[in-house]
Amino acid sequence: VIAGGXAAIIG
């Protein structure tokens, strides 16, 4: 979940 959130923020 944490990794996904980060990815979303970067995107």
Swiss-Prot record:
Q: What is its EC number?
A: 3.4.21.-
- How far does the signal peptide extend, from start to end residue? none
Q: Extract the GO molecular function terms from the UniProt entry.
A: serine-type peptidase activity
Q: Which residues cross the membrane?
A: none
Q: Which domain of life is it from?
A: Eukaryota
pH behavior: Optimum pH is 9.5. Active from pH 7.0 to 10.0.
**Biological process GO annotation list?**
proteolysis; regulation of defense response to virus
Instruction: Give yes or no: UniProt keyword Mitochondrion.
Output: no
Q: Outline what the protein does.
A: Serine protease which has antiviral activity against cucumber mosaic virus and tobacco mosaic virus.
This protein is called Antiviral serine protease
Q: Which organism is it from?
A: Eisenia fetida (Red wiggler worm)
Q: What is the lineage of its organism?
A: Eukaryota, Metazoa, Spiralia, Lophotrochozoa, Annelida
